[in-house]
Amino acid sequence: MGGGLVKKNLVLSVSIFAVVLLFSINSSYAARETIRITCWEGYADAAMVKQFKSLVKKKYKIVVDVKASYPKDQDEFYKAAKDGTADLISPPADVAKTPRFYCFQEGNFLLAEVDLKNIPNAKNLIPFFAADKSLTHQEKRYGLPYNCGPYGLDYNTAIVKEAPKSWNIFWDPQYKGKYTINNNFPKCNIWITALALGYKYDQIFDIEKLDRAKIQEKLNVLAQNAKSLWDGSANPDEFPQLALATDWGFAAAQANKKGGKWLIAAPKEGGTAWIDYWCITQAAKGTKKKLCEEWINLQLSPKAQAAVVKNQGVSPVVNNVGKLVTATEKNLFHVGDNAYFETVAIWQVMSEKTEKAFGEMWEEAKKLRQK
């Protein structure tokens, strides 16, 4: 009897070991997926990635790895889509239809149509953004808005006591050497220079409607008197030394987290604004594409859109964030304010001639910084 008991215990032990071993093997071979994201820095932060991984594991029983890369220029979004090195990209709205970046060549679409059934949070888009056709082609949608912000006029309230009323403050001699402006989006500086000269929204996106020589003269001064030029995003560590800055909103938000007192002005001439989209490239197929749609849906959730305000210093695109932000944030970043977005000039696709001219004008202006 004793020997039988030992045998039974031995069999039981072996069985338990086998079950544990089998479970371990199955766990090690659990479904895995990698999502490659090319996006502006901050759009795939650690908190968002952690939340996404948890969601995917719970909903799909998939262990997902997120590999993010951060471009400095918009051409990197096009290259990532063209080369298939990213599954998700976050380009400005006008990129996909800009001639040199065109993503809808017959027989060679670089982007995948999004399935709105998998992105239920899209129903909360503010009407202005829901109606935007930037990423619509042949009545099909190839992306969804994520956030919106200005090429804004930021001012340091510790130095500039009253809110600037005009873009012309950049040409005020007292601020020579005390401001920073963008370098790698030449069009933005031509736009604000044109607005400062009195041109209207329906003129600034077309070189044929502008006096090139007149704008060049003023642009030269803007470039020459800047303390610095920034690529990608302005450097918040430089902000304590500055009185003024152009900014997407990100740098001012970061500077304020470090004790800065920066605000965004509302120039009387108006201003331009970008919309960044989430787009899925043709590289994402099957389950990978569905996981990309889950990412977009998560990014349109109230919590993620509130983070757009608090972490990025720009505007959310949905209408259900109001309770998650302060009254000051709601006012400053026009949270849920559809009427406001109707008043700004959203970046438009420009002709190759205009793009080329603006690039040449900026390079000419920068030459004066070297003298």
Predicted regions and their residues:
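Early extracytoplasmic/lumenal segment of secretory-pathway proteins
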Residues: 31-103
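A ligand-binding cleft/hinge motif common to bilobed small-molecule-binding domains
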Residues: 94-101, 244-261
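Short beta-strand->loop
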Residues: 110-123, 143, 260-272, 282-284
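A bilobed periplasmic-binding-protein/Venus flytrap-type ligand-binding module shared by bacterial periplasmic
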Residues: 152-159, 194-195, 275-288, 307-311
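Periplasmic-binding protein-like
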Residues: 178-188, 211-222, 258-282, 298-322
